[in-house]
Amino acid sequence: MITLGHMLALGAVLFAISLAGIFLNRKNVIVLLMSIELMLLSVNINFVGFSRQLGDPSGQLFVFFILTVAAAEAAIGLAILVTLFRTRRTINVGEVDSLKG
């Protein structure tokens, strides 16, 4: 049986992996977006665990809102990434130093 401790441990491990991905790789935009998505999913696991433990479905409902925001964030991030690659021919964060049009 999966307990709250198992879900919290999994959420903490995934959050730590995503945090390490953000801090260790600051050059590639795709890895940064994937790390942010993994961070949101680890928070969702914690919401589901607490919702299940307390018997309140509002935490699981909140997960759907987070997933919707995460999908919109990924779509906008990838659109910006495609535009950035078309104009600058790079996805390296270090080479993008200004937001001039």
Curated annotation (Swiss-Prot):
EC number: 7.1.1.-
Subcellular compartments: Cell inner membrane
Superkingdom to which the source organism belongs: Bacteria
GO CC terms of this entry: NADH dehydrogenase complex; plasma membrane
Enzyme's top EC category: translocase
A GO BP entry: ATP synthesis coupled electron transport
Primary site of residence: membrane
Subunit structure: NDH-1 is composed of 14 different subunits. Subunits NuoA, H, J, K, L, M, N constitute the membrane sector of the complex.
Protein name (record): NADH-quinone oxidoreductase subunit K
Organism: Stenotrophomonas maltophilia (strain K279a)
Gene name, Swiss-Prot/TrEMBL: nuoK
